[in-house]
């Protein structure tokens, strides 16, 4: 029975602990402070900045707001205004102004009003949302958490491949011995994404570059979450989305960059900068995972042309979309570009789907 400010303080520490424990976030952030602990708070009041997180190995800081609400509550513009203003201003390290590299709003509700949605879109520095549905999936063993002792929090246990997945893994690896392109066809719900990760681990042996292409941001989030939770090697994660809204197929909602579960990059130069910085300081073996929407494939292509980096394997999810058969008027060209090795340099390509497209002879 805590009062509201005690609840708020508990929730901030709860989120801080998630950032330091979750396999997704602890690989990205090397330190997380409450505002009171933040060494550069300048003795100022928090004005809505509840936590500050420092990116691993880089002098980049993220401002975080933690919103502890009923799950039916809708986050409003008024709820985020103060935070947006405060985090738009610099803080000082040894008298030198430093701007936040990005901003994150964590909430225990999935609901946002239209005005609140509109206000966080296209902000500089960018705003990312982590909502209740995302928190549930960040790789925490929720049964381990004791409300009065947050240090009890543990990572969720990793899975082991099921017999049908073992068969799929060995068949794909066998195929790749003689050819550089293959298909992985598995029914929905049988663990395609997980199976693909185990294929990637076997190919890279913990050291390499992997591109995973998806048609939507929600699939990008799902895949990224699953892969970093289940990966048995050290990894670095890069999320790439296009600047414009990533639209999905008809009848589905338009998604936005604010919904990527880790901060996403929208341009090739920024991606090169991020990759090069980490490449220069990291001497340990890692798998570098690049998660991208098909709509942003241009960014990946430019990035490769600048760095000369080649992917060891590229995974095309929902691969039936890459056949070039389009709905009337739909722009599917981004989906087809992945086949072209002069556009995306990759030693191997794996096309994944639950629904392969089959053509009658006359349509070939």
Question: Over which residues does each language-model region extend?
Answer:
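SF2 helicase catalytic motif II
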Residues: 306-350
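ATP-dependent helicase/translocase motor core
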Residues: 18, 25-27, 39-42, 84-190, ...
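Conserved Walker A/P-loop ATP-binding site and its immediately adjacent core
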Residues: 208-231, 238-249, 296
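Catalytic P-loop NTPase motifs of RecA-like helicase/translocase cores
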Residues: 72, 220, 321-325, 358-359
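Conserved RecA-like helicase motor-core motifs
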Residues: 27-32, 233-248, 261-263
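Conserved helix/coil segment N-terminal to the catalytic DExD/H
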Residues: 272-289, 293-310
């Amino acid at each position: 029975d805590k009062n509201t400010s005690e609840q708020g303080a508990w929730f901030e520490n709860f989120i801080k602990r998630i950032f330091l424990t979750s396999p997704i976030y602890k690989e990205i952030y090397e330190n997380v402070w409450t505002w009171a602990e933040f060494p550069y708070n300048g003795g100022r009041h928090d004005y809505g900045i509840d936590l500050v997180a420092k990116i691993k190995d880089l002098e980049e800081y993220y401002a975080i707001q933690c919103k502890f609400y009923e799950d039916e509550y809708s986050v409003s513009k008024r709820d985020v205004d103060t935070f947006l203003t405060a985090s738009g201003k610099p803080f000082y390290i040894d008298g030198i102004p430093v701007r936040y590299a990005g901003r994150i709003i964590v909430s225990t509700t999935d609901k946002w009003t239209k005005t609140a949605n509109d206000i966080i879109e296209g902000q500089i520095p960018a705003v990312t949302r982590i909502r209740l549905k995302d928190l549930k999936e960040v790789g925490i063993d929720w049964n381990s958490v004791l409300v009065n002792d947050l240090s009890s929090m543990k990572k969720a246990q990793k899975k082991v491949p099921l017999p049908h997945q073992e068969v799929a893994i060995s068949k794909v690896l066998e195929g790749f011995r003689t050819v550089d392109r293959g298909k992985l066809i598995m029914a929905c719900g049988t663990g395609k994404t997980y199976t693909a990760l185990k294929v990637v681990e076997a190919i890279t042996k913990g050291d390499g570059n992997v591109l995973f292409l998806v048609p939507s941001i929600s699939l990008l989030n799902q895949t990224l979450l699953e892969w970093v939770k289940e990966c048995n090697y050290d990894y670095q994660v890069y999320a790439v989305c296009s600047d414009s809204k990533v639209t999905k197929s008809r009848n589905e909602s338009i998604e936005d960059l604010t919904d990527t579960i880790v901060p996403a990059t929208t341009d090739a130069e920024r991606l090169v900068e991020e990759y090069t910085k980490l490449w220069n300081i990291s001497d340990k073996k890692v798998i570098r995972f690049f998660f991208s929407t098909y709509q942003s494939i241009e960014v990946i292509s430019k990035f490769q042309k600048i760095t000369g980096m080649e992917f060891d394997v590229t995974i095309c999810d929902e691969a039936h979309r890459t056949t070039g058969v389009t709905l009337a008027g739909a722009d599917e060209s981004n989906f087809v570009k992945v086949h072209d090795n002069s556009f995306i340099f990759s030693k191997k390509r794996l096309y994944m789907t639950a629904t392969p497209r089959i053509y009658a002879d006359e349509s070939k």
